[in-house]
């Protein structure tokens, strides 16, 4: 667990979090809390499910500018996991998420993309983030094999500057 926290801290001032195989939040770095401003307190009661947090109407969803694209990306990731392991808990999670109101789609079709940026409103303005997922390749501890690190990088210099500012404000608060 210390190795996970070390990687998360090393990613600061950019947001990073660790989730279990069911997308429950295990740990996060100090760059994450400022991005959760305005989220319903109910969604932040452990166990916090990151998929629910991002797609729930009282979660991050109202602030995600490309919600239709981000939602489809999240669903595709869940479908891949379900195809690989047929986990009933993941199937139930997907069904639950699909009951949330679908965002109005733009006229342009949503194309499958290797990288789907997360475009989200924040206290520092609009952020454009590119996410990566990391898993431990040779875990000695079985619990590490069930963790994934979700790290977000700025997609542009404006976002990088805003994230550094948010982090500095939060770290000194």
What does each of the following model-derived ranges do?
Residues 1-2:
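Short, charged amphipathic alpha-helical "coupling" segments at sensory-output junctions
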Residues 6-7, 12-103, 111, 173:
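PAS-family sensory domains
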Residues 108-172:
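Low-complexity, glycine/alanine/valine/leucine- and proline-rich hydrophobic stretches
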């Amino acid at each position: 667990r210390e190795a996970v926290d070390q990687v998360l801290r090393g990613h600061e001032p950019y947001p990073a979090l660790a989730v279990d195989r069911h997308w429950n939040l295990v740990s996060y770095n100090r760059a994450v809390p400022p991005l959760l401003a305005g989220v319903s307190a109910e969604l932040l009661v452990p166990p916090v499910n990151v998929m629910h947090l991002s797609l729930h109407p009282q979660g991050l969803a109202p602030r995600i500018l490309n919600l239709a694209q981000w939602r489809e990306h999240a669903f595709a990731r869940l479908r891949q996991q379900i195809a690989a392991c047929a986990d009933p808990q993941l199937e139930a999670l997907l069904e639950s998420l699909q009951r949330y109101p679908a965002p109005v789609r733009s006229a342009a079709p949503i194309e499958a993309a290797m990288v789907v940026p997360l475009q989200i409103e924040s206290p520092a303005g609009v952020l454009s983030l590119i996410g990566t997922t990391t898993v431990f390749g040779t875990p000695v501890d079985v619990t590490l094999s069930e963790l994934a690190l979700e790290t977000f990088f700025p997609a542009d210099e404006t976002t990088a500057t805003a994230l550094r500012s948010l982090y500095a404000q939060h770290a000194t608060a």
